[in-house]
Amino acid sequence: MSILVKGQITITKGFETWKQMVYEQDGKLAEHGIKFLFAGTEKDDPEKLHVVMMFPNMESIQAFQGDEELTEKRRLAGAVIESGVMTPISGDFFTNYPEAFISH
């Protein structure tokens, strides 16, 4: 079963720079099985990025965290890696949009 993760990290080069990095790393993200369900900054603090990501399993989360090449790309895009917090969400949740969780 997939694992949802809520993440928060500080970004210093703006949301557009970070978003462009994500698009450029699409192949690497697919390699880890990562899907972004949401990404956006706080209304009053554009340096605080919040994400909801879906990983296929715990091993893919660990692989993402240990991927030095991807970490460096994130750092170059302004992500302050040391500020990042990733919180796995329990399997006990609901959504009004179940199609986001259907494998295509």
Where are these regions (language model features)?
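Short S/T/G/P-rich N-terminal loop/turn motif that feeds into the first structured element of a domain
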Residues: 1-71, 80-104
